[in-house]
Design a protein with these regions (language model features):
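Motif-centric detector for short Cys/His coordination patterns
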Residues: 1-92
Length: 92
């Protein structure tokens, strides 16, 4: 099972996450802010509370906002693949 093993906030919109298979990198989460559920993450103090839930291994914040670890893994994998193929995803 692929699980996150380390996470930290990098900026108000980005986190660094590392998975147990070695995949790691920064993920900009600003795309989540369009959904009202994630609006609190715009607050830098809340954003900085990011951690890995010990029971579910999901990515969580102090105010009970959760992001699926598998979604983030696949998102990061896609970002790495696009980078390797020299594809600018911002132009799609």
């Amino acid at each position: 099972m692929i699980l996150p093993v380390f996470i930290k906030p990098v900026s108000n919109n980005q986190i660094f996450v590392k998975y147990n298979d070695g995949l790691e990198g920064n993920i900009n989460l600003s795309f989540l802010f369009k959904n009202f559920i994630y609006q609190d993450l715009k607050n830098e103090e809340i954003f900085k509370t990011v951690c890995i839930d010990k029971e579910t291994n999901d990515i969580v914040w102090a105010n009970n906002i959760t992001i699926c670890k598998d979604m983030l893994y696949n998102h990061l994998k896609l970002l790495k693949l696009a980078d390797n193929l020299k594809i600018d995803l911002s132009k799609l």
